[in-house]
Amino acid sequence: SGKIVAVIGSGMTGLETTEILNESGNHVVVVEMAEEIAPGTWFQLKDDELSRIQKYDTEFMPGKRLMKITEDSVILEDVRTSMLTTVTVDEVVLSLGVRPVNALAKALENQYPYVVTVGDACKSGRIADAVHSAYDAVMRIK
């Protein structure tokens, strides 16, 4: 409570984290490298979450890339102009997204003739994408 917190990344996890931090009495600065907040997020989810966040004094900084975290600040680079900005903060939360970890699938592909990776193991995305990839895999089973 009472801290200035930078949340780096504005996907759903970053926005939900922002909401909790706001509710706990913190001032939150949301930093997003993309030009828009919550890029690639379904607009219904984005609008719902932003409606809860915007009643607080949350700062949004789209188009900024995290360059460095210091003891009491974050240094950000504007993605268009390359200008650096220093924002004083007490805490930093990294919410930078996910990448699939599929080393097991790669190992199994060398041992078995038919291995299919589905869902977030092949590509991070939405639940609908994961279900669709699983359905496609099942339909290819002979």
Where are these regions (language model features)?
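Acidic, Ser/Thr-rich peripheral helices and adjacent loops at domain boundaries
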Residues: 49-52, 92
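A conserved short coil-to-beta-strand element within the FAD-binding core of flavoproteins
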Residues: 62-73
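Short acidic, glycine/proline-enriched helix-loop-strand junctions
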Residues: 42-43, 49-50, 59
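Short, hinge-like loop/turn segments at secondary-structure boundaries
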Residues: 46-49, 134-136
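Rossmann-like dinucleotide/flavin-binding elements
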Residues: 1-41, 77-91, 95-142
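A conserved amphipathic helix/loop scaffold
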Residues: 52-53, 57, 108
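Residues that recognize and position ribonucleotide moieties
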Residues: 59, 67, 85-87
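General small-molecule cofactor/ligand-binding pocket signal
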Residues: 59-61, 116
